[in-house]
């Protein structure tokens, strides 16, 4: 296990349902990003998750799988499994329900599992729609969810997820101020060095995903250089 995950400043999220060339994968893997997270919300299966893992594993970066559901969980050939619970949804399936179904599997490698407390804040994102997250909450409510996740539920990661749009830095700042032990992740809309540097002021780890597909690897490199 890569035990230094708490020190990662920049991680890159790759979607098994989207295509990258071999050259693009090589550039991403050698960009200076600290780790790769293999994750997506729609059309994610064990097969395409495993295929993406096989494409990137030769580069030696820490590999994390963040499954959308039990159907896309893999353990072989990866370092960690990030499992999200959505704090700001009233649909219990996304807090603990799907987790219960998954835990019926006797083959779970618990040593690789890292729980995440997701706070989803983009109502137009796939993750927002699928989970029924209440994305219109205030900064105070976000901070309260973050505090509960950290102090009460003891989640090791609190993840502010704007997924596809750039978020409010003040909300991220407030969330960071509310936690004492968890690592604060921020993901959403980071497509420039300036945005990466701004969110890195408040989050321990920034996540760059869509920019890889929408703006190219050059933009990813700029975000890495801004925070490393």
Swiss-Prot record:
Organism of provenance: Methanospirillum hungatei JF-1 (strain ATCC 27890 / DSM 864 / NBRC 100397 / JF-1)
A single GO BP: glycerophospholipid biosynthetic process
HAMAP family: GGGP_HepGP_synthase (MF_00112)
Superkingdom: Archaea
Binding positions (Mg(2+)): 15, 41
UniProt-listed InterPro entries: GGGP/HepGP_synthase_I (IPR039074), GGGP/HepGP_synthase_sf (IPR038597), GGGP_HepGP_synthase (IPR008205), GGGP_synthase_archaea (IPR026438)
An annotated GO cellular component: cytoplasm
Enzyme nomenclature, EC number: 2.5.1.41
Subcellular location: Cytoplasm
Keywords of this entry: Cytoplasm, Lipid biosynthesis, Lipid metabolism, Magnesium, Metal-binding, Phospholipid biosynthesis, Phospholipid metabolism, Transferase
Classification via CDD domains: PcrB_like (cd02812)
Protein task: Prenyltransferase that catalyzes the transfer of the geranylgeranyl moiety of geranylgeranyl diphosphate (GGPP) to the C3 hydroxyl of sn-glycerol-1-phosphate (G1P). This reaction is the first ether-bond-formation step in the biosynthesis of archaeal membrane lipids.
Residues that coordinate or bind sn-glycerol 1-phosphate: 13, 159-164, 189, 209-210
Required cofactor names: Mg(2+)
Disulfide bonding pattern of the chain: none
Protein name: Geranylgeranylglyceryl phosphate synthase
Functional pathway: Membrane lipid metabolism; glycerophospholipid metabolism
Enzyme class: transferase
